[in-house]
Amino acid sequence: MPAPDDPPHGDAPSQSGQLVDRWWSRIAAPTPIAPAELVELREELDAAAVAAMSRVHVDADDLPVRVPKSRLADLARCERSALASAWSVDPRRREGAEALGLLRGIALDHFVTHQLTEGRVLEALPALVSMLTAVADDESLELLDSVSIDEAETALAPLAASVADSWGGLDPAWMPRTQSRASLVLAGGAVICSGVVDVELGGPTTGLPGVVIEVKSGRPAPEHQAEAYLYALLVALRDGVAPVGVARWYPGSDPASTPVTLGVREAAAARLADTTATWVELVAGRTPEESPGVWCRWCAESDRCPSARTDDVRESHP
């Protein structure tokens, strides 16, 4: 097993261990974050959540107030749209390029998991159908049915190949975990912040430093880095040990990696505290602000919202 202070190198074909090696070589070892500093961050987040809950009345039926990772991104776009999404209002049906963008993101998560647990995906489209059927993901299967077979194969085959080239032969010493949950319970259980981490490598039980990895099928966007920082925060508070780095991987590109310093942790905590306060207010009944953008195209409120954007600007889903 590689030493924790050395880049791990496995005997791997193609790029294999090179993917992790490239991340690792770009992450300068940060000053370790003391457990007491993590405890302090948790206490500050808890105090902020308690304060937010004390300023408003939240009905018992709306407890606990849930703040998943997706809520941060939704609120950064539009409060009214975030409420519509959270209350399980069916969004507008996505078609064409938008549907393919969503499918790429769904497929990427499944393909990376398959690569790390069972090996290479050989036939992308049949494999994805099988994976979605196995977990009874009818919504994604319906989305898949909305595009032609040729469109789906053209979009998915290169994705599966890129996953195999980049993730094949990963040193098992890293003990990769996919789609793992990290939750933070605040204000005596009244607020729950959570996220699902795409890939975790290393960590307390492995003898290796921890690395948190987000995989993204679309183009790099500023909010992606903030999402990765949030995951690093949640994992640190879950495990009591901070990962040393976060990375974002986009198929066909070199990974973007950042060491996890205390400053990174504090910035993520401040953003989470602000978002929690905003969401608590909205759940309690505050009128949401409206911020039009390309997301109006799939917002269920667009027919009723006076601020809804009506042009035909499109955006691929990350």
Residue ranges and their predicted role:
Residues 143-144, 155-173, 177-183, 247, ...:
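Charged, terminal alpha-helix-loop-beta segments
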Residues 178-272:
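Mg2+/Mn2+-dependent nuclease catalytic core
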Residues 96, 100, 104, 152, ...:
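Hydrophobic (often cysteine-bearing) scaffold residues that line and stabilize catalytic clefts
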Residues 103-180:
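A non-catalytic, helix-rich entry segment at domain boundaries
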Residues 78, 104-108, 199, 231, ...:
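A residue-level signal for conserved active-site and pocket-lining positions in enzyme catalytic cores
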Residues 1-15, 21-23, 33-35, 220, ...:
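Metal-dependent nuclease catalytic regions and adjoining charged, substrate-binding loops involved
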